[in-house]
C-alpha cells in the first residue's frame, strides 16, 4: 500500500486535485482510501456525490467510545473509501491534535488492514506545515510520499518551499520523501517554466501541469469529480494523466529547500516580480 500526502497552501486546490486524482486511480481499478485532514471536512465530498459526511471527531463526540468503522468510512466513487478527520469547534482546541486522534482511531478500527486490499491511502492535509499536528502524516511515517500542489503565484511557491523544509526535517526519522510538485495553474505568466525550474532547484520534478479550466468548478457545483461528471472532457484526461504519473512515479527525493533570496531571484528571473 502506497501512503501519499497532498500538501500545499490554503486555497490552492488540494482537495479538488486530490479527489480528481483519486477518481482517476479508482477508474483505473485501484483501491484507494482518502483521509481528509482538514477541519473544513471537504476532502471527500466530490467522491461521495456531494455528501458532507460526518467527521471522525464529531462521531467520537456523539458516540463516545462506541464507534464502528462503518460509522466513519463511506464508500465513494468506484469503491473509493472516504473518511474525514474533522476538527474541534471553532475557537476551541487544536485541529492538528484532532488529526492525530482520527488517524490513530482509524488504525485501531482496522481501516488499513489487508482485508481492504488498499493500493493507496491519500491524506489531504490543511495548508502549510505550520504546526506539529498537520505535520503528523510526515512526522510519524503515516505518509511516505508527498506531492505539493502549487502554482506560479509567489505565496504558493513560498508555501511549497516551506513544506519542503518540513519534509527535510522528518526525512530521516519518518522515511518520507517528496514525489513532486503538481502545478495547479492560475494562468500566471511563464508558470509552467517557473514551476519546472523551482522543482529542479529543489531537486524534484513537476509531475504534472494541470491547466486551468472552469469545467472543474462546473463539475464541483454538480458535486462530482470531472471524471465522474463528464469522462469525455479534456480536463478528465488531465487528471487521468496525473493519476497515471503518480502511479508510475519512481522519483522520490529528500528536497533541498531554497533560501528566501533564491526564491525571490527565481520570481524575478521569470518576470513575475517585475
UniProtKB/Swiss-Prot annotation:
List the keywords (alphabetical). 4Fe-4S, ADP-ribosylation, ATP-binding, Iron, Iron-sulfur, Metal-binding, Nitrogen fixation, Nucleotide-binding, Oxidoreductase
Q: Which cofactor does it need?
A: [4Fe-4S] cluster
Q: Name one GO biological process term.
A: nitrogen fixation
Q: Which reaction does it catalyse?
A: N2 + 8 reduced [2Fe-2S]-[ferredoxin] + 16 ATP + 16 H2O = H2 + 8 oxidized [2Fe-2S]-[ferredoxin] + 2 NH4(+) + 16 ADP + 16 phosphate + 6 H(+)
- List of residues binding ATP: 8-15
Q: Residues bearing ADP-ribosylarginine?
A: 97
Tell me any Pfam family this protein matches.
Fer4_NifH
UniProt cross-references to PROSITE patterns, sorted A to Z: NIFH_FRXC_1, NIFH_FRXC_2, NIFH_FRXC_3
CDD domains xrefs: NifH (cd02040)
A Gene Ontology molecular function term of the record: metal ion binding
Q: What is known about its processing and modification?
A: The reversible ADP-ribosylation of Arg-97 inactivates the nitrogenase reductase and regulates nitrogenase activity.
**E.C. no:** 1.18.6.1
Q: Which InterPro entries match?
A: NifH/chlL_CS, NifH/frxC, Nitrogenase_Fe_NifH, P-loop_NTPase
Record: residues binding [4Fe-4S] cluster = 94, 131
Q: How is the cofactor bound?
A: Binds 1 [4Fe-4S] cluster per dimer.
Q: Which NCBIfam families match?
A: nifH
Say what the protein does.
The key enzymatic reactions in nitrogen fixation are catalyzed by the nitrogenase complex, which has 2 components: the iron protein and the molybdenum-iron protein.
Q: What is known about its subunit structure? A: Homodimer.
Family (UniProt): Belongs to the NifH/BchL/ChlL family.
Output this protein's name.
Nitrogenase iron protein
Where does this protein come from, organism-wise? Chlorobaculum parvum (strain DSM 263 / NCIMB 8327)
Amino acid at each position: 500500500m502506497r501512503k501519499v500526502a497532498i500538501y500545499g497552501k490554503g486555497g490552492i486546490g488540494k482537495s479538488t486535485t486530490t479527489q480528481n486524482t483519486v477518481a482517476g486511480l479508482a477508474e483505473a481499478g485501484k483501491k484507494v482510501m482518502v483521509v481528509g485532514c482538514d477541519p473544513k471536512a471537504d476532502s471527500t465530498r466530490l467522491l461521495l456525490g456531494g455528501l458532507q459526511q460526518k467527521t471522525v471527531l464529531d462521531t467520537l463526540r456523539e458516540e463516545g467510545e462506541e464507534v464502528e468503522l462503518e460509522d466513519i468510512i463511506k464508500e465513494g466513487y468506484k469503491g473509493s473509501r472516504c473518511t474525514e478527520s474533522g476538527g474541534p469547534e471553532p475557537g476551541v482546541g487544536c485541529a492538528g491534535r484532532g488529526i492525530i486522534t482520527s488517524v490513530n482511531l482509524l488504525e485501531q478500527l482496522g481501516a488499513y488492514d489487508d482485508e481492504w486490499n488498499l493500493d493507496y491511502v491519500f491524506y489531504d492535509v490543511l495548508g502549510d506545515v505550520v504546526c506539529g499536528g498537520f505535520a503528523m502524516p510526515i512526522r510519524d511515517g503515516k505518509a511516505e510520499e508527498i506531492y505539493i500542489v502549487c502554482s506560479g503565484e509567489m505565496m504558493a511557491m513560498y508555501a511549497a518551499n516551506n513544506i519542503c523544509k518540513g519534509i527535510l526535517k522528518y526525512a530521516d526519522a519518518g522515511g518520507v520523501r517528496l514525489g513532486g510538485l503538481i502545478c495547479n495553474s492560475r494562468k500566471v505568466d511563464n508558470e509552467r517554466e517557473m514551476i519546472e525550474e523551482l522543482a529542479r532547484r529543489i531537486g524534484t520534478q513537476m509531475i504534472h501541469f494541470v491547466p486551468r479550466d472552469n469545467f472543474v468548478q462546473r463539475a464541483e457545483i454538480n458535486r462530482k469529480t470531472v471524471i465522474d461528471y463528464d469522462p469525455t472532457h479534456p480536463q478528465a484526461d488531465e487528471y487521468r494523466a496525473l493519476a497515471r504519473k503518480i502511479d508510475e512515479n519512481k522519483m522520490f527525493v529528500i528536497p533541498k529547500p531554497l533560501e528566501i533570496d533564491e526564491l525571490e531571484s527565481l520570481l524575478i528571473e521569470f518576470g513575475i516580480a517585475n
